[in-house]
Design a protein with these regions (language model features):
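Short connector loops at helix/strand junctions that flank enzyme active sites
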Residues: 50-54, 62, 73-75, 80, ...
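Unchanged
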Residues: 86-176
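Acidic, metal-coordinating catalytic segment for phosphate/diphosphate chemistry
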Residues: 19-56
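Glycine-rich active-site/cofactor-binding loop and its immediate structural neighborhood
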Residues: 62, 67-96
Length: 185
């Protein structure tokens, strides 16, 4: 049974999704899929397959010219910090926690009052963990941070760096990542 904070957070996300206006066709197509997933009580559990809610942080520097990305150890990709909700239905808190854990940043300022982007992406099977291919229903928040602040690479990453937005495609040219950059223009 969900507590009142969890119910409130889930309802808040559902309301935000229903009210969300985007010019991107792929995001519009994701909205009903997110809403359908959120009807399941285990949507925030990583064990819920074929997919579950995740939260991530698109962190830009103070002048908006760079983004902080991590080189994910298991996926071998440059990505924004983020991860599993593990039952926490406050997806903003999930994104903030993951940003702190994966970058060491403790002073992040949210830009905007709601999520910045949504995405559904496939995660390959992990035979070493006996985990099948599944989808991450990623709720992305925009944050700003001081690029001079000390960074700390987590065990989940092999590298961490501020990347000029103009060079982003050299690190990750996936459509959903480039969409995040285009939203800053």
């Amino acid at each position: 049974m969900m507590d009142s904070e969890a119910t409130s957070a889930r309802e808040s996300l559902l309301t935000s999704l229903r009210d969300y206006k985007t010019i991107y066709n792929e995001e519009r197509a994701f909205i009903p899929r997110f809403i359908e997933l959120l009807e399941h009580p285990d949507a925030y559990q990583r064990t819920h397959l074929p997919g579950h809610i995740t939260g991530s942080a698109w962190i830009i520097n103070d002048d908006g010219s760079k983004v902080l990305l991590v080189k994910h150890a298991a996926l071998h990709k440059w990505l924004q910090p983020g991860g599993h909700a593990d039952g926490d239905e406050n997806v903003f808190r999930v994104a903030l926690r993951e940003a702190n854990e994966e970058t060491g940043l403790t002073h992040l300022t949210q830009v905007g009052s709601s999520f910045f982007d949504i995405d559904i992406h496939s995660i390959p099977a992990r035979k070493d963990l006996s985990f099948p291919q599944h989808d991450h229903y990623d709720v992305r928040f925009l944050f700003q941070a001081d690029e001079k602040a000390e960074l700390k690479i987590s065990d989940e990453s092999t590298d961490l760096r501020w990347i000029p937005l103009s060079d982003l495609q050299e690190f990750n040219d996936e459509k959903s990542i480039l969409r995040l950059r285009s939203k800053l223009a």
